[in-house]
Amino acid sequence: MPPATFPILFITATRIGDAVLSSGLIKRLSDEIPNARFTVVAGPAAAGLFEDIPNHDRVIPFAKAKDGSHWFDLWRQVRKTRWGLVVDLRGSGLSRFLSTRRRAIYRKVAGPPIHKVQEAARTLRIEDEPAPPYLYTSPETEQRAVDLTAGSGPILALAPAANWLGKTWPIERFARVAIELLDVDGPMAGGRLLILGGPDDTRYVEPLARTLPRDRVIDLTGQLDLLTAYAVLKRARLFVGNDSGLMHLAAAAGTPTIGLFGPSDDRLYAPWGPDTRVVRGPREFEQFKAIDPGLNQTIGHMMDLPVDQVVAAARELLDATR
């Protein structure tokens, strides 16, 4: 007789990048508890990351309401279940009142900043062996990625947009990186350019899409759900992008990843994994905070990151991952 299912409520982040960085905990729990069944709560933008988990019951998109009623709505959806484990990476009060055998609730700990992967692992007390980000994909998702990337030559994936102008490296510099790496004398000679971004980025990336002949450009901006983007990124030889959810998807996919940083803290948000690099200009995060304390001004903070520095990092990473 098979064992009874072990229901796990997993409450994760609103933002895509944070949700990706916590995703390895589901893989770890699934490996250690074979009869686990997951209900995942995530922000609407990130919820799609968890749709292909093979042993999930529900994915609940969790949209914040100005009056705070979103917590009561979530309570109504989850309160009747007797949970085996509640993992709450938001540290909410709701989790303390649910019926469960065990709880693992995020608590802020004093001390120096630690990476978000380690912070999530600390909630399960596995910070000495943190769970690397991991996303499940269905055979159908993988096949679509195969079809979208069909062709010959290595793929350079670029994600030139970000959720804020301050974190966005100029589009013309991404174009120069593409030319340097994919040129006949470049380390990815004969390769193809893959461009990724959200629906609002379509016009922004147009200059980049014109960098190479059409038959060497795969512009999927605004066309993919998150898991298909993840599956497509598995097929790239190299990823270069701003600090964004796509950067974390690329690193989780195992693709050699270069994250371009300026006014964001790479101690917390560096791409996770051995085949990743952080590239930033001459200023550290604290210097950006000093001139833009709220990190919300309409200022292009990435102007002092030169193309040559990014290309050099790309060449080094390509050599290291041959």
Predicted regions and their residues:
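Catalytic machinery of carbohydrate-active enzymes
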Residues: M1-R322
